[in-house]
């Protein structure tokens, strides 16, 4: 295929949040800690104030560039979990990258009209949002290399299934949008992570070719606020 110009693939959302606008504010105090080791997908041992604690990590990704021994993280006290703390962000490339995937749909809702449905069952999946004639699925992205944001950072059968469901909805006359939230501001464009999940990459480009709109937004953590920075395009690439 010829070089792709992503400008034709970016879908607008109905409620335009201004660049620099806060989309989420942590009410808890954020504390600096350091990673000792990642115990499993959702549990990390950290040091804070000279003591070791277990912290909940609400992000199933591999996060090898973010959660590794010695790296600086931000934690906050949380209730309702077996651990006292949750990891909020990790340091990379002179900035903190927000890691808590519980925030994704809260942030996404800021860009939607007031009247929307959540968690709509479609086939064997649930799509995050529906408004008017549009279905919208949200994905969080934390991996950036050489100013390119990549998703996923681990193979995702669920992500591939969502793309198939969005394509089926388009065939039925609905609009479909994939909203990608890049939780850092050092990316200039986005690509599916073909190296990590080639099957997702194939589904992604097939969906684009069939009319899926993709909207990619970048954010940064400033103090205790998550700030919307800007939209970025798909990277130009030669597909074979």
From Swiss-Prot:
CDD domains: SfsA-like
Bridged cysteine pairs (disulfide): none
InterPro entries noted in UniProt: SfsA, SfsA_C, SfsA_N
GO molecular function per UniProt: DNA binding
Family named by the database record: Belongs to the SfsA family.
PANTHER family to which the protein is assigned, alphabetical: SUGAR FERMENTATION STIMULATION PROTEIN A
Protein name, UniProt field: Sugar fermentation stimulation protein homolog
Provenance organism: Saccharolobus islandicus (strain L.S.2.15 / Lassen #1)
Gene field: sfsA
